Swiss-Prot record:
Location, primary (coarse class): secreted
Protein name (record): Cysteine-rich with EGF-like domain protein 2-B
Glycosylation-annotated residues: 188
Source organism per UniProt: Xenopus laevis (African clawed frog)
Signal peptide: 1-24
Biased composition (Polar residues): 346-355
Protein localization: Secreted; Endoplasmic reticulum
Gene name for this UniProt entry: creld2-b
FU repeats: 191-238, 251-298
Length: 361
């Protein structure tokens, strides 16, 4: 392996190790934070489990012994992690002595378990507004990371680089500049408020369409302000022949013509340019032609009638007839008389003989 290739491989391995360590530090802080939350939940559960019986004097006397007892700590720790949560169980096992130390010796002086355990004792988290192995202040300061307009990378963890991920309205390293589509209503060295431009503006320096620096798509400059461009007014429609154009603010919609139309300028049969097959123009709108009223008979089979439909017609068998092999034939009722209860199908003469024989016995 030549020297250049070996150097690149070493640099790649170093980068991978660095990334893995950063992820591990972030995950460790998340695990510790969750562990502390579960610990506080355990405090609530053990308090409810052992008290609240109504004997206040007895509870106060007993509580003073139980609330900081080893028994209570064991009950909490036994239920602090799910059995499948490897990271949580590993952290408890690795740092159980620290938890016991806080419980028996440090709790009164340092009541904030997250701060004492996660930040100061095992050093997997940072105070809010700081980041990285040394808990450096985020850009903009730990009190208002990213000047309150974004999120600090690694905030509260031992990972990240402290850079700002700005909210949609803001941009820049410190989240003090306004993004396209927003203008600055307040601004100083440490504070900025960005408000959305008028919908007509792509960029602006104020709230109205007269304050646009550049118009958004679908708007054009007219007399110093951005106004809606009516795409539907162009000579060539942006829609298909079977659709009409409907202008909207900054855009347009293509909507299907009425079924009676062959091309249209708007909604309904009165907006047809031409009528579709099966329709004729009457009183300014396309109306269905009733082909069944024509003098020439359209349905020629015996026992067949004509039914008008929108824009057409269909031939169907008359009531009481059905189509069989191209002919309308009468529907035959099936003869299937029901056998009444008690009937056996035995001939009457035989039945009488049987009855007679039975009577003779």
């Amino acid at each position: 392996m030549n020297g250049s290739r070996a150097w690149r491989l070493a640099a790649w391995l170093l980068l991978c190790l660095s990334c893995s360590a950063a992820v591990a530090r972030k995950d460790s802080c998340e695990t510790c934070t969750k562990l502390v939350e579960r610990f506080h939940k355990g405090l609530e559960n053990t308090a409810k489990k052992n008290f609240g019986g109504g004997n206040t004097a007895w509870e106060e006397k007993t509580l003073s012994k139980y609330e900081s007892s080893e028994i209570r700590l064991v009950e909490i720790i036994e239920n602090i992690c799910d059995s499948s949560d490897f990271e949580c169980n590993h952290m408890v096992e690795e740092h159980e002595e620290q938890i016991e130390k806080w419980w028996f010796k440090m709790k009164q002086k340092y009541p904030d378990l997250l701060k004492w355990f996660c930040i100061e004792a095992i050093k997997v988290c940072c105070p809010s507004g700081s980041y990285g192995p040394d808990c450096l202040a985020c850009l903009g300061g730990s009190e208002r990371p990213c000047h309150g307009n974004g999120f600090c990378s690694g905030d509260g963890t031992r990972s990240g680089d402290g850079s700002c991920r700005c909210k949609a309205e803001y941009t820049g390293s410190f989240c003090l500049e306004c993004s396209d589509g927003y203008y600055s209503s307040e601004r100083n060295d440490t504070h900025a408020v960005c408000i959305a431009c008028n919908q007509a503006c792509k960029t602006c320096n104020g709230p109205s369409n007269e304050d646009c620096k550049e118009c958004n798509n679908g708007w054009v400059k007219d007399d110093g302000k951005c106004v809606d461009l009516n795409e539907c007014a162009s000579e060539e429609s942006p829609c298909k022949d079977s659709q009409y154009c409907l202008n909207t603010e900054g855009s347009f919609l293509c909507k299907e013509c009425d079924g009676s139309c062959s091309g249209c300028s708007g909604e309904g049969p009165e907006s047809c340019k031409d009528c579709a097959t099966g329709f004729v123009m009457l009183s300014g709108k396309c109306t269905d032609v009733d082909e069944c009223d024509a003098s020439e008979k359209l349905c020629l089979r015996e026992n067949e009638v004509c039914l008008n439909t929108a824009g057409s017609y269909k031939c169907t068998c008359s009531e009481g007839f059905e189509d069989k092999e191209g002919n309308c034939v009468k529907i035959m009722e099936t003869e299937n008389p029901e056998i009444t209860e008690g009937e056996t199908g035995t001939p009457a003469s035989d039945t009488n003989i049987l009855n007679t024989a039975h009577e003779d016995l």
